[in-house]
């Protein structure tokens, strides 16, 4: 075979290798994911026509708490987005999932490595009369390239699983955000309820104090007995204890809100408001509609799909890894000759 024929052979082989790689890439192993279904009757005796799922309820808004019309609650909810540590952790986990997905996707592309080395050696003389050989320098540069052919779909399945984990992490972030806002709203309304309770208990304490004073005056005048005074004192002590319990409960809710907004409880305070609790208009809905607002359900379903994709990656690991690789290198005794 002449020299020109040998040079032409690689150019003819490369298209064939590329075509074979594309054909073999379709041999992805592992089961295809099928979303789980739940057996349901054809009709329910309590309901008539079916309603298609359409989660367009205003209550699903990202700022659902504004329906209560409370400016203090709105300001606290805005601080949750900035300072809540649970949200920061969920966001970091989402960024981690994105980075891992990018790393899995990088396996589609070839990898390149470069090496460099330098040695200096000297050979001792074999006889006493012979002089020592001068030291010899050696410089080398090398490069390697490799590309794994995804014959069995291992890389494809890993990328699919990583992308599904990103979707699950995104749903986890939405669940963490919903949980933080809902917990803050619950604690805030409990605090406002404690304010109202404390207001009525303080009024009751003032009334019992007046009643005790009147009873003591009646006792001094000989109109009431000692038992009436003792009963009035007992009622006053009970009212004061209830008022103290309401104050302690309010402090606990205030401290919980401080933690949710990322502040130290010692330096955080919410002014008491003697006003009725706001009531939002809650739309009439179905339990199935409420499930559409559950991001944790979406996260669980995405993890099932990711586990299904991981089955294919595990099955592909049983087969040999096929790839293409090439390497080249140079060695010179003079560094200037190597880099020019």
Regions found by a protein language model. Name each.
Residues 86, 158, 197, 228, ...:
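DHp/HisKA histidine-phosphotransfer helix
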Residues 27-48, 78-150, 182, 250-268, ...:
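A small-residue-enriched
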């Amino acid at each position: 075979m002449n020299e020109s024929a040998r040079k032409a052979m690689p150019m003819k082989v490369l298209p064939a290798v590329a075509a074979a790689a594309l054909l073999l890439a379709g041999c992805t192993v592992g089961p295809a994911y099928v979303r789980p279904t739940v057996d349901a009757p054809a009709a329910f005796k309590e309901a008539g026509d079916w309603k298609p799922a359409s989660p367009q309820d205003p209550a699903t808004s990202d700022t659902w708490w504004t329906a209560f019309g409370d400016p203090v609650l709105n300001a606290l909810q805005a601080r949750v987005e900035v300072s809540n540590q649970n949200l920061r952790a969920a966001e970091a986990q989402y960024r981690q999932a994105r980075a891992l997905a990018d790393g899995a996707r990088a396996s589609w592309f070839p990898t390149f490595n470069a090496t460099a080395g330098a040695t200096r050696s000297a050979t001792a003389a074999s006889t006493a009369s012979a002089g020592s050989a001068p030291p010899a320098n050696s410089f080398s540069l090398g490069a390697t390239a490799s590309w794994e052919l995804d014959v069995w779909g291992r890389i494809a399945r890993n990328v699919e699983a990583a992308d599904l984990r990103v979707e699950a992490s995104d749903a986890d972030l939405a669940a963490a955000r919903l949980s933080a806002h809902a917990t803050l709203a619950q604690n805030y309304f409990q605090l406002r309820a404690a304010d109202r309770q404390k207001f009525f208990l303080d009024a009751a304490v003032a009334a019992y104090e007046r009643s005790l004073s009147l009873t003591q005056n009646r006792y001094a005048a000989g109109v009431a007995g000692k038992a009436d005074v003792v009963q009035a004192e007992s009622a006053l002590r009970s009212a004061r204890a209830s008022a103290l319990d309401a104050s302690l409960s309010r402090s606990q809710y205030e401290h919980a809100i401080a933690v949710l907004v990322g502040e130290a409880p010692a330096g955080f305070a919410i002014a008491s408001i003697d006003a009725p609790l706001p009531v939002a208009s809650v739309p009439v809905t179905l339990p199935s509609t409420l499930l559409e607002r559950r991001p944790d359900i979406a996260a669980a379903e995405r993890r099932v799909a990711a586990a299904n994709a991981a089955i294919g990656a595990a099955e592909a690991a049983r087969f040999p890894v096929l790839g293409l690789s090439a390497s080249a290198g140079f060695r010179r005794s003079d560094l200037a000759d190597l880099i020019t």
